[in-house]
Design a protein with these regions (language model features):
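C-terminal amphipathic alpha-helix
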Residues: 1-2, 38-82
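Short, solvent-exposed, charged loop/turn and helix-capping segments
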Residues: 3-30, 78-82
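Extended, hydrophobic/aromatic-rich amphipathic alpha-helical segments that build helical scaffolds
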Residues: 30-40
Length: 82
C-alpha cells in the first residue's frame, strides 16, 4: 500500500549517499515522509475511534511534513542556483 511505498522510499533515501551540501535536503525529505506516515497512523485512529485529539495530532504531523518538504525544496533550489 501507500504507507509501505513511503517506507521503501525512506529506506532507499537513508542508504543514499549525497554531497555534504545536499545532506540537509535529504534529511528534510526523510523527515517529511516520516511525519506523513505518522500522520496517517493517527488519522486512522481518529477514523476508528472518533477521537478528535487523534485528528489534531494527524493534522499537526501533516503540517510538519509539509514544512519539512518545503524546506527541502527551498534548500535544493538555493544549492542549484548558488
Amino acid at each position: 500500500g501507500y504507507i509501505d511505498n513511503l517506507k521503501e522510499i525512506i529506506l532507499f533515501a537513508k542508504k543514499t549517499t549525497v554531497q555534504q551540501d545536499y545532506k540537509p535536503v535529504l534529511n528534510n525529505y526523510i523527515d517529511s515522509i516520516e511525519n506523513e506516515i505518522e500522520s496517517y497512523v493517527h488519522y486512522k485512529k481518529y477514523i476508528v475511534t472518533g477521537n478528535l485529539t487523534e485528528n489534531k495530532i494527524s493534522m499537526d504531523l501533516l503540517s510538519k511534513a509539509f514544512n519539512y518538504e518545503t524546506q527541502a525544496i527551498n534548500l535544493y533550489k538555493q544549492l542549484e542556483l548558488g
